A protein has these predicted regions:
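The feature captures the beta-strand-to-loop junction immediately N-terminal to the Walker
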Residues: 33-35
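Helix-to-loop junction immediately C-terminal to a conserved catalytic motif
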Residues: 48
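ABC ATPase NBD coupling module
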Residues: 52, 64-85, 111, 123-127
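ABC ATPase signature
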Residues: 91, 132, 145-146
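Conserved ABC ATPase signature
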Residues: 128-132, 136
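A short, proline-enriched helix->beta-strand linker immediately N-terminal to the Walker B motif
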Residues: 147-151
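Catalytic Walker B motif of ABC-type/P-loop ATPase nucleotide-binding domains
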Residues: 153-157
Length: 170
């Protein structure tokens, strides 16, 4: 499980999250909903270490990871697919997926498995990332994250730009 305990997160001097405590267990699906600007993205960034904690603790399993870098937290198997698509526009879909598999942790996610759940990417393997629609870029971002075989995958606006049939597959 990953959790924040009595966490404060600041943007400069402004308090963005105050005394927030949240726990998400492995293999649990949780949706965080709220109005724009409520702190949903900030919460996800705090969980993965992209936002430092001004107070409180960040815990993974039974390990305090409050002082670990985002890279160290990623190596422990926590991945975030941000709301802004992170792909390499000058690389092909296949090359983008191969980069995702470099940080490969043992598990069942392979390029072939990703292409099974996102068949549209199979059709676009030779296309550059900048030639993809927004929904295809989102599929590629999620696929790259899955290839790291994370223990925990956090998704920010995961269905943005995806067709309803793809959302159902996810």
């Amino acid at each position: 499980m990953i959790q924040l305990e009595h966490a404060n997160v600041k943007y400069g001097q402004a308090l963005a999250l105050e005394e927030i405590s949240v726990q998400v267990d492995f293999h649990e699906m949780v949706a965080i909903v709220g109005r724009n600007g409520a702190g949903k993205t900030t919460l996800l960034k705090a969980l993965v270490g992209l936002m430092p904690l001004a107070a409180g603790r960040r815990v993974l399993g039974d390990q305090d990871i409050s002082d670990l870098s985002v890279e160290s937290i990623a190596k422990l198997g926590v991945a975030l697919v941000p709301d802004t698509r992170r792909i390499f526009p000058n690389l092909s879909v296949h090359e983008n997926l191969k980069i995702g598999s470099i940080a490969h942790r043992p598990g069942h996610w392979t390029v072939d498995r990703v292409l099974e759940i996102f068949p549209r990417l199979q059709e676009r393997l030779g296309f550059g990332g900048d030639q993809l629609s927004g929904g295809e870029q989102q599929m590629l971002s999620i696929g790259r994250a899955l290839l790291g075989n994370p223990r925990m995958l956090l998704l920010d606006e995961p269905t943005e730009g995806l067709a309803p049939v793809i959302v159902d597959q996810l």
